[in-house]
Amino acid sequence: MRDYLEIIRRNLMSPIVIAIFLLALALLYAGERRDAWFISVVIAVNTVIGIVQEVRAKHALKQLELMSAPRARLVRGDEVVEVMYDALQVGDEILLEAGDELPADGVVLSARGLEVNESMLTGESASIDKKKHDEVYAATTVIAGSARVRVTAVGDATKAGAISATLKQYMPRLTPLQQAIQNAITFLTYCAIVLSLLVFARYRIAGFESVRILKTIITSAITIVPEGLLLASSLLLAFGSLKLAQAKVLPQKLSAIEAMALLNILCTDKTGTLTSDEITLERVEPFGSGNEPVKQLAAMVAHETSGGNATGQAIITALDLPYEYTVDDILAFSSARKFAGVRARVDGRVRTLIMGAPEYVARMAPLSTAEQQQIEKWTDDGLRVLLLAEFDDNNTPLKSLKSGSGRPLAVILLRNLLRDGVVDTVAFLQRQGVNIRVISGDNPRTVQYVARAAGINNPDTAITGAELAELDEPAFATAADQHTIFARVLPEQKEHLIAHFSQQNHQFTGMVGDGVNDALALKKADLGVAMYAGAPASRRVADIILLNNSFNSLPLGMRLGNQIMQAIEVIATLFFHKIIYGLVLLAVTLVLGVIHPYAPRHITFLNIFLVTMPTIMWTLFPPRSHHRINPHNFWRDTLGAVTPIALVSGVAVSITYLMLRAMQPHDQDTVSTMTVLVATFFGIYLVFLAGPMLGVVLDRRAKTARMLYIAAALLVASTSFAVPLLRRFFDFTIPTLAMIGPVAGVVVIAALLQWHLARRAGKTYQNR
């Protein structure tokens, strides 16, 4: 409820709303009731509509957010049920696995190789072992092992409660584009104040009465300040988020849509992203005599340490466990170590076993040259290779086994096929100018094989995490820029790489991942993309969640995001057209010292056709673009395209006004009526110019919407003239043919010139 009250307060207390209401009170005090009541009602209606739309969008996004919100596994008797974090109570018992974010503070009842990252609380990224009776804290992450925990504190009562309380407050953050629009509104507001002073001084010198000066000041302010542009962009981003969610791409932040439009580097994991979730065991190749039960030993290590990950499940599914064994100690798998271990009594014999990446396990259990060459051959074929080793030392903790003290028993070969459609997805991204980098914890040869099969450019440029670790910062930066494949990379190295790419000028970096080892990198990226089935910790920090767990959803998401950004550009041109032509008309009247043709209610009437109705149309039916939109070029693309057209509108409206004023010097109502009609025509005409001007493509629905807009505009305009009450309210008169003839010539010439300018702007736009 607090979130919605904040929305209401923010909309009602907007400086623009307050200023317009104060000006309306001034008009009321001056006896101009029609203008006072009309602009008050209009701004009130617009504010209510804005509140309703924002509340609806907030509610819808909150419902979607609940879809991706992580759940806690609550133990109830003999059952385990998934519940929302806020449903937990002190005394509840929950189960934790690798990748989980702790939902509450608690005490460990039992643990199997539990390691926790407490960097969210302490800033230290090193993992911490947790045993029975140890305390664990909310907002920390399980990076290895599993545990059963009794909840001791929830919500604001946890150690991270102060942080959580801050996060609960509804503090909408503007996207970079929205911030630019907000800055423009602030700047134009100051301009309106300066212009108001100029209007007051010039018209006071010219001898105009105070009421007329006040009306002109209000008219100028309403014309210049694009008060609805920020709201329009917010609603477009919100409704765009809903459309993306329907396409199985869930933005957790409004800025994600803009980020997709800016993306030019995409770092992706291999397993579960480029390749499918399904990993299959090809075979087990024993070393030595082959008398050891290596398949059963590998199955035992996977069963006790994998924490349910896909690699472990593939081994467990394909191989049988030993008939009987008792575990003495385990070392759960973690991405930082690249291996796992078990010490167990099997058939009466103590076995100390390590299984993991050959490069890491071989440091403790050396391989012969022939064995290393054979492993390289398997990785060249795209197989994922694990090395199983045994140690005679049955007393030293598994973490502290001596280098070189073990012997290799076997290699486990697994196959992980490309996801369907990955080749097309990679091709689409690269056509859009996105540079794809693969950052993986796997063997470099295996990663290169997958990258080559996926069609990623420059797959032969590879470097390992061990090589990166030996480089100083300048050399690291050079290596990062020169390589496409980063293999056997540690989680903190992933974060370092993402930070480097993001710091480059005009580089906007995305990261796609699903594991707990990806969480740091996802958080550091400009655009973090997580899989719905991935670790809760990665989902928590991501900007976008792929609800169908498919990397192939990104192109559709980028297309929809591009549509939304294009719609914002089109709507912005409507506002800028209104502002620029209004400034031209105001400048002409100030220089010549003549009365301004509009009353405040005329500006509101014009805004219906120039801004409100087209904005609704483009919001409901966003256009498609021939090219990829870049929000960095927002001002150049919008102002650069519409300024010449708006100047023509301003000159044409000014000529019309001065010409009619000369023809009918004593009939201000008729002159104002014709001036309003001409300005309305140019506003409606701009909707047709948007296509050639910005390279917009209208599908059948958008073309139908445009025709409905024309029909609605004609209906509203004709009603305003046909109904005597409305006609009198706006001080409109029925134009005569004698006045329409000269005006038509000016309008036709201006319209032809604008069409030429729009076509030229479109060609320039598309050639950038």
Predicted regions and their residues:
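Hydrophobic alpha-helical segments characteristic of transmembrane helices
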Residues: M1-A72, D156, L167-Q246, Q430, ...
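Conserved beta-strand/loop elements of the cytosolic catalytic core of P-type E1-E2 ATPases, chiefly
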Residues: I49, E79, T152-G155, K168, ...
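Membrane-embedded transport module
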Residues: V199, L229, L237, N458-G510, ...
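Cytosolic catalytic regions of ATP/NTP-dependent phosphoryl-transfer enzymes
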Residues: L262-P408, L414, A427-F428, I436-R452, ...
